[in-house]
């Protein structure tokens, strides 16, 4: 297990101890009550146990991220990937770790975490991870890789952000005309997203973002 402090070790140990103490009893009761589907419930018990343990480690990771403890963040994220990759906590942990490591200047580790999250998370989580990964790659001047990370079409609601970041990468490459086109696309996508949501709250939230996109476009002499 990673090198956690005593309180964190206790949190994780408590999650494991519950299943060690009561797991057989719970599983046994289920099997007695549902003879013939014991295998299914046994698997469910295993999944529940994995989720409980992964949840405890994810809690340690988020606390470490808030404390900007890079070593502990890496250790917890690594344990989630190594032992609990089948749970939703592993990609969420990689996403949190990637952001924290990027903010701390560890671009190499951030890239590794976000790449994993972009390949193993849910659809929306993958899109968030791809956006963050592309931002890391842009900061690292890995422009072609950043554009590649943005290539697959994202889920609805992410299109404007993807187009904007594509524009940022193209601008960094000195491709002003292509960057202008990407920002124009981002504005168009944002308008479509606002129309689809049909909410005054959503429209208000999109206002400042629309202004930002327009400023980027104006800086390039676009309309």
Language-model region placement:
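Soluble extracytoplasmic domains of inner/organellar membrane proteins
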Residues: 84, 89, 99-223
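N-terminal positive-inside, membrane-proximal cytosolic segments immediately preceding the first
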Residues: 1-32
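Transmembrane signal-anchor/signal-peptide helices with a preference for the extracytoplasmic
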Residues: 2, 36-56
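Amphipathic alpha-helical repeat elements characteristic of tetratricopeptide repeat
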Residues: 9, 51-55, 71-74, 161
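Short extracytoplasmic
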Residues: 56-92
């Amino acid at each position: 297990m990673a090198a956690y402090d005593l309180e964190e070790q206790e949190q994780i140990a408590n999650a494991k101890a519950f299943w060690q103490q009561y797991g057989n009893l719970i599983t046994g009761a289920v099997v007695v009550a549902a003879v013939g589907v014991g295998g299914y419930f046994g698997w469910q018990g295993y999944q529940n146990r994995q989720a409980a343990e992964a949840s405890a480690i994810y809690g340690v990771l988020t606390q470490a991220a808030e404390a900007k403890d890079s070593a502990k963040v890496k250790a917890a994220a690594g344990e989630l990937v190594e032992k609990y990759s089948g749970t939703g906590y592993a990609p969420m942990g990689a996403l949190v770790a990637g952001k924290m490591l990027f903010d701390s200047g560890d671009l190499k580790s951030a890239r590794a975490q976000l790449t994993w999250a972009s390949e193993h998370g849910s659809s929306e989580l993958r899109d968030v991870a791809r956006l963050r990964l592309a931002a890391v790659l842009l900061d690292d001047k890995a422009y072609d890789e950043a554009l590649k990370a943005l290539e697959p079409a994202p889920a609805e609601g992410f299109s404007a952000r993807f187009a904007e970041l594509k524009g940022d990468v193209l601008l960094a490459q000195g491709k002003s005309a292509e960057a202008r086109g990407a920002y124009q696309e981002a504005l168009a996508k944002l308008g479509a997203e606002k129309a689809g949501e049909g909410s005054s709250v959503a429209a208000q939230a999109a206002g400042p973002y629309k202004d930002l996109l327009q400023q980027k476009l104006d800086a390039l002499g676009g309309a």
